[in-house]
Amino acid sequence: MKVKILRYHAIANWTWDTPKDDVCGICRVPFDGCCPQCTSPGDNCPIVWGKCKHIFHAHCIQNWLATSGSQGQCPMDRQTFVVADSTNEKSETQ
């Protein structure tokens, strides 16, 4: 028996590789949503891992670091915030 496919409508779902129900430490919005500056999640609203292992929306941490009171520190642990290399850091944590 042969089956001929006439149409195919694929549906996909994506999520960030973050702990379940985790939220941005600055805006308190889940990572599967978008930060207050953005209108849609995904490429327009990426997330950033710090070497300290804290995760933020890119826009949120950029705005935080731009304030004079932040002194370039992570808002969660006050270490100097440095963006982690995504390939090396992700393999170390797995």
From Swiss-Prot:
GO CC terms of this entry: anaphase-promoting complex; nucleus
Top-level taxon: Eukaryota
Molecular function GO labels: cullin family protein binding; ubiquitin protein ligase activity; zinc ion binding
Keyword Zinc: yes
InterPro entries: RING-box_E3_Ubiquitin_Ligase (IPR051031), RING-H2_APC11 (IPR024991), Znf_RING (IPR001841), Znf_RING/FYVE/PHD (IPR013083)
Function description: Component of the anaphase-promoting complex/cyclosome (APC/C), a cell cycle-regulated E3 ubiquitin-protein ligase complex that controls progression through mitosis and the G1 phase of the cell cycle. The APC/C is thought to confer substrate specificity and, in the presence of ubiquitin-conjugating E2 enzymes, it catalyzes the formation of protein-ubiquitin conjugates that are subsequently degraded by the 26S proteasome.
Name listed for the protein in its UniProt record: Anaphase-promoting complex subunit 11
Name of the encoding gene: apc11
